């Protein structure tokens, strides 16, 4: 099958062997797959991610649920925002059948442990024609929902998870820094919960327009106006929760310096590089 293969931190389109479903697994045809910012970061800064992952694993007790680490010298197919159609089933599959359209948590498990789909040498992601998924983790796509929209399930889930972890309440306000897919997912979930005001910040006019459509009360171009200034003009009183959804060095420090006293900051963007913050900023703004 054809696939976009990453090897030694380089990407190429190549022919690779078709995967085969094992017990409890299904073979699927990829209908749509998004390009996540973390995939782009991995190409540029994956070595830092691997080194940090190995260091943390060595410092923690063994965990059978920790995904196995990929080897960059071996071929790997990225892509974890996908929608697929089942084309074949492995032994023990009793719910799914060929023709079913599904999305899934980007993880697979077998006798050797847990693997991160799209970050695994064994389980190719959605930048390929075919994928193997575990039936247990697959979710049926409602009839009539286009595949490209269904593929947004994973980034939407990341945004919803961030909002849940923030413990934001009806008496709080929110700033979302970065209005890519995950930042927009945060906006949508905040609006669904009735949080307000919500201020979004991004350099892209198109993304700012999407954020307004999804429920932002105010959007700003950070090159022209600080997000916190917009919050002060609209409200300036309610406790503030800041969602950092950019994931590049310097953003966390910028968020800490921007946020007023008593604010909470949620790290949503995936920064794979070392970063630096000034702890005294946080202490002074407690």
Task: Show where each model-derived region lies.
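Short amphipathic alpha-helix with an adjacent loop that forms part of the alpha/beta core around
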Residues: 225-237
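Local beta-strand N-terminus motif with an aromatic residue
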Residues: 128, 171, 216, 238-239
């Amino acid at each position: 099958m054809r696939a976009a293969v990453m090897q030694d931190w380089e990407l190429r389109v190549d022919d690779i062997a078709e995967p085969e479903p094992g017990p409890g697994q299904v073979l699927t045809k990829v209908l749509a797959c998004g390009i996540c910012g973390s995939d782009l970061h991995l190409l540029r800064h994956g070595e830092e991610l691997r080194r940090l992952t190995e260091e943390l694993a060595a410092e923690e007790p063994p965990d059978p649920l920790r995904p196995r680490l990929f080897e960059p010298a071996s071929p790997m197919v990225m892509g974890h925002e996908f929608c697929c159609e089942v084309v074949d089933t492995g032994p023990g599959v009793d719910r799914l059948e060929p023709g079913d359209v599904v999305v899934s948590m980007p993880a697979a498990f077998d006798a050797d442990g847990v693997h991160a789909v799209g970050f695994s040498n064994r389980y190719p992601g959605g930048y390929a024609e075919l994928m193997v998924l575990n039936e247990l983790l697959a979710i049926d796509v409602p009839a009539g929902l286009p595949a490209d929209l269904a593929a947004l399930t994973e980034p939407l889930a990341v945004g919803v998870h961030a909002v849940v972890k923030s413990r934001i309440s009806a008496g709080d306000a929110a700033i979302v820094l970065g209005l890519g897919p995950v930042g927009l997912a945060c906006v949508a979930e905040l609006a669904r919960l009735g949080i307000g005001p919500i201020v979004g910040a991004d350099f892209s006019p198109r993304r700012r327009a999407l954020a307004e459509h999804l429920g932002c009360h105010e959007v700003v171009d950070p090159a022209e106006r600080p997000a916190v200034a917009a919050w002060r003009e609209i409200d300036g009183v309610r406790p503030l929760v800041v969602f950092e959804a950019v994931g590049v060095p310097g953003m966390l420090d910028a968020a800490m310096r921007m946020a007023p006293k008593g604010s909470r900051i949620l790290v949503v963007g995936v920064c794979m590089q070392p970063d630096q913050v000034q702890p005294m900023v946080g202490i002074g703004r407690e």
